[in-house]
Amino acid sequence: MQLNPSEISELIKSRIQGLEASADVRNQGTVISVTDGIVRIHGLSDVMQGEMLEFPGNTFGLALNLERDSVGAVILGEYEHISEGDIVKTTGRILEVPVGPELVGRVVDALGNPIDGKGPVNAKLTDAIEKIAPGVIWRKSVSQPVQTGIKSIDAMVPIGRGQRELIIGDRQCGKTAVALDAIINQKGKDLICIYVAIGQKASSIMNVVRKLEETGAMEYTIVVAASASDSAAMQYLAPYAGCTMGEYFRDRGQDALIIYDDLTKQAWAYRQISLLLRRPPGREAYPGDVFYLHSRLLERAARVSEEYVEKFTNGEVKGKSGSLTALPVIETQAGDVTAFVPTNVISITDGQIFLETDLFNAGIRPAINAGVSVSRVGGAAQTKVVKKLSGGIRTDLAQYRELAAFAQFASDLDEATRKQLERGRRVTELLKQPQYQPLQVWELAVSLYAANNGYLDDLDVKQVLSFEKGLRESLKTSNADLIKRIEDTKDLSKDDEGALRSAIESFKKSGAY
């Protein structure tokens, strides 16, 4: 069949007129491979680092590797239905999670989707999970305390609002217990808590949530869970999602506390993603930017000035500074704190609480090693009464540890050395504390006062904790006004000190312990 040129031109003209051109300017590419949640895409020429990508079946991914002729992306969620040849579209957006007071009391995943079976989270706002930390100009120095209710921490390693304090130790030595006690102790203290569980067993996360509900702590807590059964991408993103939720409160002049339990598992997840993306491995097979992974997260915890809050809220909130306090947890292997991730996080944070398996097994719980645990900025935030009384405790313990090592070799000890050893044993006993029983400021002050002034020296070591408990009960019944004054002023005046001394002496004479 022969077509003349006029017929061809007519045919082309009719085809052009019948063409329906859609105004979809989004860039798109094709999947060339899918392995372990990592997708290689060809043809996405106009894509940003960290941009959300849309896959078939309402599935989204995150662009992480931008190479010359392909893009490496990680899938958020299930990826079994994605196959070679599928069309991928750019969205022009970066990953956001819901934020706001609607999340308080809920358990959500790394993307802010509820997983507690209590219906949808009706959050009105969303915010980007990757944000730049406030600059130096907008920050304030740490000056208000975060009371953990744990004697050894509040006395020797105090934490302030806006601080980053690392909790580090081997597995099964009480790291999560310390973090949970800190959350439980915030009841009535106007502090929103966020607990980010990374790479833990789902049953362990459930136990944490149950305990928080039993103690009434879920009323002011958000739980962000990326369990061991979730993908590496979810475990990598969970801390950033939790941090964004905490920043909502910080930027509006409120105080928040965030616990990352634990960042070792996040580093493992990031290492897995990086190796699958074929990024060059470095020390311990971690990628080169594993320091930046944690520094950009922990730098977002800060105390921000009143000017910052006023500017952020467009003048709605005035005269209020906000804070986000971070307690990252790091798990060590056989006590090795010189490994890559522990040394990185130690250098980023404002101090660390070392927990030791040997102390834990010896029955000293919380198993805090007072000698190497420090708080670089928390001293300025300590309450007056605790600051006044805690100096002696740290010295007693440090001298006791030193002398105890020598005492093993010496057979005859002089009187002063023996007294110091005896005092040290009693202080060590006094700092033991059962889980889920955080103390108020006045209770800590009374215990420290009794230890500093020698009221425990003539007791048997086994009687120390029963004496402490009995003394607290006695003060509650007969000296309620004294307790109220200490709790209100957070200080111990000369008159109150005299009243406390006589109360302790009369209780000791009664022998009711």
Curated annotation (Swiss-Prot):
Subcellular locations according to the entry: Cell inner membrane
InterPro entries registered for this protein in UniProt: ATP_synth_asu-like_sf, ATP_synth_asu_C, ATP_synth_asu_C_sf, ATP_synth_F1_a_nt-bd_dom, ATP_synth_F1_asu, ATPase_a/bsu_AS, ATPase_F1/V1/A1_a/bsu_N, ATPase_F1/V1/A1_a/bsu_N_sf
Keyword Secreted: no
CDD domains the UniProt entry points to: ATP-synt_F1_alpha_C, ATP-synt_F1_alpha_N, F1-ATPase_alpha_CD
Keyword Phosphoprotein: no
GO terms of molecular function: ADP binding; ATP binding; proton-transporting ATP synthase activity, rotational mechanism
Annotated site (Required for activity): 373
GO cellular component: plasma membrane; proton-transporting ATP synthase complex
Membrane-topology descriptor: Peripheral membrane protein
Residue numbers binding ATP: 169-176
Catalytic activity from the UniProt record: ATP + H2O + 4 H(+)(in) = ADP + phosphate + 5 H(+)(out)
Top-rank lineage group of the source organism: Bacteria
Record-listed E.C. numbers: 7.1.2.2
One Pfam family hit: ATP-synt_ab_C
SUPFAM superfamilies assigned to the protein according to its UniProt record, in alphabetical order: C-terminal domain of alpha and beta subunits of F1 ATP synthase (SSF47917), N-terminal domain of alpha and beta subunits of F1 ATP synthase (SSF50615), P-loop containing nucleoside triphosphate hydrolases (SSF52540)
Subunit (UniProt): F-type ATPases have 2 components, CF(1) - the catalytic core - and CF(0) - the membrane proton channel. CF(1) has five subunits: alpha(3), beta(3), gamma(1), delta(1), epsilon(1). CF(0) has three main subunits: a(1), b(2) and c(9-12). The alpha and beta chains form an alternating ring which encloses part of the gamma chain. CF(1) is attached to CF(0) by a central stalk formed by the gamma and epsilon chains, while a peripheral stalk is formed by the delta and b chains.
Function: Produces ATP from ADP in the presence of a proton gradient across the membrane. The alpha chain is a regulatory subunit.
HAMAP family: ATP_synth_alpha_bact (MF_01346)
Family from the record: Belongs to the ATPase alpha/beta chains family.
UniProt-listed PANTHER family: ATP SYNTHASE SUBUNIT ALPHA, MITOCHONDRIAL (PTHR48082:SF2)
Name of the protein in question: ATP synthase subunit alpha
Species this chain originates from: Burkholderia lata (strain ATCC 17760 / DSM 23089 / LMG 22485 / NCIMB 9086 / R18194 / 383)
Organismal lineage: Bacteria, Pseudomonadati, Pseudomonadota, Betaproteobacteria, Burkholderiales
